[in-house]
């Protein structure tokens, strides 16, 4: 396994898709590496301790193995949970979709990461009438 490196980063999950029986493919937005695609093996199993934290709008600290274009998630820790409801939830998903559409893979944008975090904090605070 030469050429592999382990990285640790703050990250937000923009989207997750089922992969095989027990895994997920994650699209994550990281502070220093931008948009990444990760494989989270075994997280859909009933005994998985990480399944409950792999949700959109949660600030996570992730560790991953960088082997190829598809990286392997090694560990995840929940740092901050943004709870979005009703219209705020739809706005959050729309922002996630925009990020996925316009960001290039592995193109760092730390300033946009901070702005995204601010948007989520604001959406979590406001009532639907204010959005």
Regions found by a protein language model. Give the residues of each.
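Non-catalytic alpha-helical scaffolds and adjoining flexible linkers that form interface surfaces
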Residues: 1-24, 29-131
């Amino acid at each position: 396994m030469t050429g592999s490196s382990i990285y640790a980063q703050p990250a937000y999950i923009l989207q997750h898709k089922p992969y095989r029986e027990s895994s997920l493919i994650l699209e994550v937005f990281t502070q220093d590496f931008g948009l990444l695609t990760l494989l989270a093996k075994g997280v859909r199993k009933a005994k998985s301790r990480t399944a409950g934290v792999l949700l959109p709008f949660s600030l996570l600290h992730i560790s991953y193995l960088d082997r190829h274009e598809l990286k392997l998630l090694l560990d995840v820790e929940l740092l901050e949970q943004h709870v979005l409801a009703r219209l705020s939830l739809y706005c959050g998903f729309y922002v996630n979709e925009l990020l996925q559409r316009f960001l290039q893979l592995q193109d760092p944008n730390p300033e946009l990461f901070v702005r995204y975090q601010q948007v989520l904090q604001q959406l979590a605070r406001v009532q639907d009438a204010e959005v």
